[in-house]
Design a protein with these regions (language model features):
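S-adenosyl-L-methionine
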Residues: 1-138, 142, 194, 254, ...
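Short internal loop-to-helix segment that lines adenine-nucleotide cofactor pockets
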Residues: 68-99, 148-149, 158-161, 166, ...
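Hydrophobic packing residues within well-ordered alpha-helices of enzyme cores
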Residues: 112, 135, 212-216, 241
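Short helix-capping segments at alpha-helix termini
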Residues: 117-118, 140-145, 220-223, 250
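Short strand-turn motif at the edge of the Rossmann-like AdoMet-binding core
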Residues: 128, 206, 230-232
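A SAM-dependent methyltransferase catalytic signature shared across enzymes that methylate proteins
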Residues: 144, 242-256
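Conserved SAM-binding strand-loop segment of SAM-dependent methyltransferases
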Residues: 144-152
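Proline-aspartate-enriched helix->loop->beta-strand connector
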Residues: 224-229
Length: 306
């Protein structure tokens, strides 16, 4: 009897993954492979179309990334709202460029590109060639011309040898002399070589945020962009990043939001130059936050100064 149960479980295991992929494919097809970022001005993003064969076997670089994309409009809702409002109100100059480092599948880069005008570009920086290949295809499908895709990992200075844990598609970097090490670039190098002026920096680099910001010193001094960064507050010393930014004349705030699809201690932060007023953002009753797709981290305002 136990042998039959074990056989059944193996069959169930073999079938569950493709059935789950087919269910996701059905959702994608039902939306005509179109995702709407309803909290960011209802920006529509067309995804690469797939066949049922792609779903059954999970083949190609597009399927898993398309599935991830489906959830992105409902991830980090408060941060998305805040950045959208800062552009809508003119708090951030639309003619300035955006650094999106750790751009992954470019769910931010693609949307934010629609906010920009004039000479403003998004610099979508990621170490994964597959992530960038997918993202370039997205930009082409959606006729977006103002994103520059850059395959790089950045640290406090160019030429550092780095290794990583995990896969290159979602890596945690560290200094290393291993034979598989990758040579770093820096934000300052990329920005100055391209002659960009920066209005927003979004830094999501899996624990390497301080190193990346240290390699942005010239940009911070010259442009004083708004900065968004992520930290795991139960495992990382947030004061290291916040104190570094305060030394450049920033005020640092935690975004009051628990992030779905992330570890429980993951939080977003926003840093604003002290020579500018804190942006006037739409206020809402915290008791209504959940109905807006926001799960507050603590009782209080949308931004909590640290």
């Amino acid at each position: 009897m136990q042998k039959l149960i074990n056989i059944f479980r193996k069959i169930q295991g073999l079938l569950s993954a493709p059935l789950h992929r087919i269910a996701n494919y059905t959702r994608l097809r039902g939306s005509n492979f179109n995702i709407t970022f309803k909290h960011e001005g209802c920006v529509d993003v067309k995804l690469p179309k797939l066949s049922i064969i792609n779903a059954v076997f999970g083949s190609g670089i597009n399927f898993s990334r398309n599935v991830s994309y489906m959830s992105r409009p409902n991830a980090e809702v408060l941060l998305r709202k805040l950045i959208f409002e800062m552009y809508k109100s003119g708090y951030i100059n639309k003619n300035l460029s955006i650094v999106d480092i750790g751009s992954w599948i470019s769910d931010n880069s693609i949307v934010w590109a629609s906010y920009l005008s004039g000479s403003g570009h998004v610099l979508a920086i990621d170490p994964s060639s597959d992530n960038l290949k997918y993202s370039k295809n997205l930009a082409n499908i959606n006729n977006i011309k103002n994103i520059n895709f850059i395959e790089a990992v950045c640290s406090e200075k160019p030429g550092m040898k780095l290794d990583f844990d995990g896969t290159i598609d979602h890596a945690e970097f560290k200094v290393s002399e291993s034979k598989n090490s990758i040579e770093s670039s820096s934000i300052d190098k990329i920005v100055y070589e391209g002659n960009y002026e920066i209005g927003l920096m979004h830094v999501d680099v899996e624990g390497f945020e301080l190193s990346v910001l240290q390699g942005s010193e010239s940009v911070l001094k010259r442009d004083m962009p708004v900065i968004s960064f992520e930290q795991h507050i139960s495992r990382e010393d947030v004061s290291k990043v916040s104190n570094y930014l305060k030394n450049f004349g920033y005020r640092v705030f935690m975004v009051n939001e628990v992030l779905p699809f992330c570890d429980k201690d993951c939080r977003n932060f926003l840093a604003f130059p002290v020579n500018k007023e804190i942006p006037q953002l739409t206020k809402f009753n915290q008791a209504d936050a959940y109905s807006l797709g926001i799960c507050s981290a603590v009782v209080g305002e949308s931004l909590i100064e640290i």
